[in-house]
Every structure is written in structure tokens, then in C-alpha cells.
Amino acid sequence: MEQFDVVVIGAGAAGLFCAAQAGQAGCRVLLVDNGKKAGRKILMSGGGRCNFTNMFVEPAAYLSQNPHFCKSALARYTQWDFIDLMNRYGIAWHEKTLGQLFCDDSAQQVVELLLKECELGQVTIRLRSDVLSVEKNESGFLLQINDLKVSTNSLVVASGGLSMPGLGASPFGYKLAEQFGLKVLPTRAALVPFTLHKPLLEHLQTLSGVSVPAVVTAENGVSFRESILFTHRGLSGPAILQLSSYWQAGEYVSINLLPDADLDAFLNNERQVHPNQTLKNTLAQLLPKRLVECLQTLEQLPDVTLKQLNAPQQAALVANLQQWRVQPNGTEGYRTAEVTIGGVDTQELSSKTMEAHKVPGLYFIGEVVDVTGWLGGYNFQWAWSSGWACAQALAAKQVQ
């Protein structure tokens, strides 16, 4: 049997970072993962460049049944702290839209940074390792990992959510929480494209690949202003992914296809200058022609010239283009979702240490916890912050 101070389950962003920090603080750490590579989701993120944090991280950008839970960890290890770490390793990065920070080169650099940090902490990393059983004993926990028995004082669960099962996602962390009597909140896919009902989808097939800036609004009033992308399955793009976290099955979403236009004024002006111009050609100055043609087949806009367009028709047109109501059929699910909403109930955990109130020595960090960030680096920051908070608690316990 092998003995460790800390075993961390899951070599994703949160697990790697926590293991490294705990190791550097003097803990003897074992990090295990069932995959053949560490940081698989990191490598896939941000189009291979890893959107590693966001300049504008704040608690309001996170969803949780307890919105206050994330505040402590985010305040104690901030985006600036991780940026400092990137700079220390000489990893070049740049800011894209809305405060999103990406590596100039490759997400591999972030994984290499984390592995180097683990090396500095003398962390033992075992990949292709399945945790077959976990038992509580007087001194901590007894784990069966493949054919190896491991004893540990502290157990950190950083096994992630259900999103992207192709990268090894599983319900392991939720089942472990339930094994020890912790409440797990219902989960669903988030930061995920919408699918559409067949009649509307058939009309929109010609738009696959078309992207437009828009403001999308959920029934609860939450809105996002970014681009939307029409796909062969439905709707995607940053604005849609963001809104999916706030959408409930059966609800409508409102899409403003012309968020920057005073459409009434534009049409009135064009009517004076080009009275015989078709409405379709006029709107093609503002929107992709394929989208205008599609909206016409959906009877969202009349087939008339500008001088034929009467006031009621114009009012209806403005409403259709700036408050287009669409009812998604559902989402693409965990297969393409970037994150999972729900998970281990934060009421079960200390917001300062991530330790379970009922089970001393058991910690949950990262996506397995009911804390879900917006698109744009927020979920990576939660991984760094929750991992750091947990590591500080592990280090303090080691000193005792």
C-alpha cells in the first residue's frame, strides 16, 4: 500500500493546479486520471489556444444555486494571479473580444506550465488509472486504483462534469459525493448550441455557416450581445452558447438581428431615396442576403417595394427583425457542451476551503461543483481559484 497526504482525482485544469500548489506547499500528492493525457480539455479549448482567463472576472458571471459561494475563492486567487504565472513562464498571450485572454501560440503551453508546476511540487502523476473504490477510514481514505491500494489523509475530487464525454467526462464525482451523503443538484448541458424544431430548421438549412451580430434574450430577461451562427442543426455562436446556460426547455428566445440599427429611420430614409426598391434588397444592405431571403420564406417580411410598405407592415417588420421569437427544440447536449450546470451542492462545501462539511478531508473543486461561468475564460478561472483555495487548506492541514 502506498501512502499520500493528498490524492487528487482528475488531471484537468482544477486538479493539475491544486495538485501543484499543494505539492509546492509540502504535501505528498498523488494525481490520478483515467485518460492517457493530462489536461485534455485544456488542449481542446479556445480553438487550441486556451482561453485561460478573463480580464473581467466577477462573481456575477457565474451561475449557482448559491451565487455567493464563488466569491471567496475568486477574490483570493484572481485572474491577475494566473496572468502573473503565465508571464513568469514567458507564455505570450493576447486579449480578444470582451476581455478574453488566449495564448498566442498553443494551449499545450498551459498544460506544460501546469505539469512543470506539478514537477516543482514533486507530484506523482498516474494516468490511465481508474479509481475503483473509495472508503473512509479513521485516518482518511482508502482507494483502490487499478491494482494498487492507496491510503491518503485528504481526497480532492476534480473529476469535472458531464460535458464532452469524448474527452473522458463521467459522473464519477457526483457518484462519489452521493456515496458520502452529499447532495448533488440536477445537471444539464451549458454553453451549448440550440437545436430547432424540424419545420423551422428546414427553412434555415440554406443559412448554415452564416454568422451575424445580434442580441439574444432569454425569457428571464438575461441577454447577451455577440454573434450568432446558423448551423445545420440549429443555432450556435457565442451569444447562443452564453444564453443556453439561462434557457429552460420549452422557453422562447428573442433575437435582435439588428441591434445597432434604427430600422424605422433607415426604412423611411431609403423610401424617400429609392421608393421602387424592393424591401428585400433594402434589407440586404444590413443583413446577409441569404438571411433576408430566408426570412421572407418564413413570412417575417413582406414581398413589397418600399413605397408599398405601409405603416402596420413596417411596425410588424421591425418587431420581427428586432424581436424574432424562436423556440429551440433543445440543445446538442453534453456531446458538444463546454460545461455542465449543476453538480455538488455548494451548501455542502466550505467556500473558503472547498471541504465537505459532513466529511472532513474530502474536497470538491472545479466543474464538478455547482458553479458555472460564462463563456470566455470564466470557467478556467474558477478551476484556478477553487484549486488554489483547496490547496491552501491542504497546506494548512499539513502544518498542523
Located regions from the model:
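A glycine-rich dinucleotide-binding beta-alpha-beta segment and adjacent secondary-structure elements
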Residues: 127, 293-372
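Short hydrophobic core segments
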Residues: 7-9, 131, 150-166, 177-178, ...
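Glycine-rich loop(s) and the adjacent beta-strand/alpha-helix scaffold that form part
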Residues: 154-200
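Glycine-rich FAD pyrophosphate-binding loop
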Residues: 23-47
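Feature captures the FAD/FMN-dependent oxidoreductase FAD-binding
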Residues: 76-154, 292
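Glycine-rich active-site loop/strand segments that organize a redox cofactor
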Residues: 49-95
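An anion/pyrophosphate-binding glycine-rich loop and adjacent beta-alpha core
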Residues: 36-38, 43-44, 52-59, 92, ...
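N-terminal Rossmann-like FAD-binding beta1-loop-alpha1 element of flavoenzymes
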Residues: 4-31, 390-395
